[in-house]
Amino acid sequence: MNYFKLYRTPHGHVIQSSNSDKSIFHQASSWDDFINQENLFDACASAFAHGTEVNFGDIHLLHPVDQQEIWAAGVTYLRSKVARMEESKDSGGDTFYDKVYSAPRPEIFYKGNSHRAVGHGGKVRIRKDSAWNVPEPELTLFINSQGKLAGYTIGNDMSSRDIEGENPLYLPQAKVYDGAAGIGPCLLVTDQALAPETVIDMRIFRDGIEVFQGDTQISQMKRTHAELVEFLTREMSFAKGTYLMTGTCVVPDYPFTLQSGDRIEIQIEPIGTLIQIVA
């Protein structure tokens, strides 16, 4: 598979290629215009060939979200269904998750925008009114303004499990708040779909000690990427494109909860690693 890594910076884009060790700076158009070109892979190839080489270590990275919305799909893995049923059984909400896992229509909800997004090296937040907070590592799709899957990045769907478990209708409060949408570090643009064997790996460190590690393959998803894209774009248009987190099954078990200062590392190759600190 050939690919380009597209990084957003304050002054333009930095592009890396699977066939080179160079980092190339490109400043020909806005982020929104560039990523919504009809053939983004070819656009990256052209920009890489005609740009200026830079030292990647000197680059200040921004999250890959400008005017895009961020959406998320839930209960797309079996383990996610089981976990959601367990956390919500006391409220009687467990049947909701059982039904949505097998239903024709997936769960899709609004996650945030550029204002609420946190990029690589940034600080994600946990709610002050929640006692059970976890990160959820998710392969995230970029869907362009034509409604086509055009790239991939890494998502960290910060979640307040006790709030969601209390009542499924509280999901927007459990999932959508300032600093709850981790995303980055780049937009991966490929010449073919990611392999089913692609691994999502998450590690959490506290005071320098690893306190959680979990991983899965995207082949464990019940729903296809095409299916999720079709449902999201069925009655909605996105003039600047949109991001769609695709769900997770790698979540720390109760009673683990995040604390301020925890370091979250989510790796999905060949995208890279998204590293964030809990504020």
Regions found by a protein language model. Name each.
Residues 1-3, 8-12, 136-137, 193-200, ...:
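A short, compositionally biased
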